[in-house]
């Protein structure tokens, strides 16, 4: 039996458990999907001690989980965020499927007329979105609660940047 789950801080709002339980049932897959709520990243070791096949990772651990992993896929390394952990041959391998999913979703709407993207947020998922935009040649501007770098602005600055956009 496969033991899979979602790793995050507050998971009551997540539909992942119900989605995967339904998927497993409809497809006759012998697996369990559990929510693994941890209040601090250091508690992850207790999750890893369980016999797990794979984990989805959500807020706020997509970046914080990386030091606890044995390997990263190339894309996860480039993005700097992990949303899937694969347990294989005794190793914990971090992957990022957010970038692929976002790229597949937005691809039909992009044209060569698009030059810039306004990205709200600077967390793990937004890093994957930024990776996609930059890989297709778009200039990315971030709006964040805590702007801390080049091309990062506060939500208070948003009106000014929208006018220039």
Regions found by a protein language model. Give the residues of each.
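Short, Lys/Arg-enriched, disordered terminal segments
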Residues: 1-2, 160
């Amino acid at each position: 039996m496969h033991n899979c789950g979602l790793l995050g801080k507050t998971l009551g709002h997540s539909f992942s458990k119900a989605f995967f339980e339904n998927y497993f049932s409809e497809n006759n897959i012998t697996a369990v999907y559990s929510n693994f709520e941890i209040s601090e990243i250091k508690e992850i070791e207790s999750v890893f001690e369980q016999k797990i096949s794979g984990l989805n990772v959500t807020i706020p651990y997509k970046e914080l989980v990386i030091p606890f992993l044995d390997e990263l896929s190339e894309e996860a390394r480039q993005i700097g965020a992990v949303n899937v952990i694969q347990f294989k041959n005794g190793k914990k391998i971090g992957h990022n499927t957010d970038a692929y999913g976002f790229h597949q979703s937005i691809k039909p709407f992009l044209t060569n007329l698009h030059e810039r993207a306004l990205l709200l947020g600077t967390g793990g998922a937004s890093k994957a979105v930024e990776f996609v935009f930059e890989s297709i040649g778009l200039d990315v501007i971030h709006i964040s609660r805590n702007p801390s770098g080049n091309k990062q602005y506060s939500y208070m600055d948003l009106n000014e940047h929208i006018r220039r956009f």
